[in-house]
């Protein structure tokens, strides 16, 4: 049977099969690094180091001793894994002091990697397979290496062409060879998104982020770092005149510019996902209940129209 319970003006469906109740997954804690610009203030840190910092910051904020064994597992999204070493999520988990017995999994679903990590963690909680999990993502686009692909075929390294892992594995469609910027242009044409629409949206985003930092709203989630105290890519003084004066990057007369596109960033974030029962027992806040989620796929060249993840 399905029992409907009204909590915080939401309806949570709790399925009961042969007397077994599905747990309700909740977000009980969060922490992240400030996000750095490409080759910016966080360039000295690898993705694993950033992930370690986010996990450590989360545990500290929750007053959970890393060695306590409270955390049943870790899921971390990471797209640019080239050169990061085996099992980046496990590296970050152990780097944060979690016990050796703690399993960790690295996920690559491109833009949706860390959201997929949260979905999997929530599913484990609902199924009763885990009680407390950490889910998040980590990336250092700055430190994505160059690779000599031809060298593996016997070509001398000095004669091999170098390929950017950031571009090849992260910013280029594997099927059409188009850059993500072009796929954005395709959807802008298809959906009738104008240059002024994109610039206006970008200005609103920067303005809101700037206001949030100025009012101290972001300080509770961003951990303290020695060389970066806030997100580095926010343009506090941006105006519509500045944005509209930038040249399109990918198509003449196109929509996507350096001012209205997503930033190439370095950073990491982590959430504590647990059952509602556990949160209440431990006295942890119930920040959000994970009610449901879905995923789907579209034609690769139309990736910017896809839901994330």
Regions found by a protein language model. Give the residues of each.
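Conserved active-site "lid/cap" helical segment
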Residues: 22-84, 88-96, 100-103, 183-195, ...
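N-terminal extracellular/periplasmic Venus flytrap/periplasmic-binding protein-like
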Residues: 32-33, 44-53, 61-64, 196-281, ...
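Glycine- and Gly-Pro-enriched alpha-helical subdomains that act as flexible
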Residues: 276-309
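Flexible glycine-/small-residue-enriched beta->alpha junction loops
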Residues: 132-186
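Conserved catalytic cysteine-centered active-site region
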Residues: 45, 78-131, 175-180, 237-263
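Active-site-proximal alpha-helical scaffold in enzymes
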Residues: 107-139, 182, 188-217, 270-277
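Beta-strand segments within the central parallel beta-sheet cores of soluble alpha/beta enzyme folds
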Residues: 68-77, 103-108, 133-137, 197-204, ...
